[in-house]
Amino acid sequence: MRSLLLALLSVLALPAAENPELARLTAADDARVAAMLAPTREKLDAVLSPELRYAHSNGQVDTKDALITSLTDGSATYSKYAYQERVFTFPAPGIALMTGRFDVKAVVKGNAAESTIGFLAVWRLEQGTWKFLAWQSCKIPPAK
């Protein structure tokens, strides 16, 4: 029994680099961020789920097609996307939640903005590949 407990604890203590599923998911999110900073339809299509629901911090909600269009036609451009915190959890097989906060600089329809954003994202394993399924975010006001 003691050996089983020690084995279980050693698996739970593995860093991300030694946890293959967490490493795959981190790589998928890194690819998503890279695609948002230098967008092409192909890069975005590869990482976004067909059923994407993307709720921006201003309340606007996009589908996959709407998000890809706004990023590739220049309506929205991101120049900074820097995580302060990014945590993954696996509540069910094939589902991952990602929570945290990041600093962003963007220009949306000609209006420049710089903010700190809090978020909850959902990733789903689709045909063996992690796909970005949902995003909900809110602006975090500066400390007073």
For each feature predicted by the language model, list its residue ranges.
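Positively charged n-region of N-terminal signal peptides that target proteins for export
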Residues: 1-4
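Hydrophobic h-region of N-terminal signal peptides that target proteins for export
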Residues: 9-17
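A beta-strand edge to alpha-helix "cap/lid" segment located at domain peripheries
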Residues: 17-46, 51-144
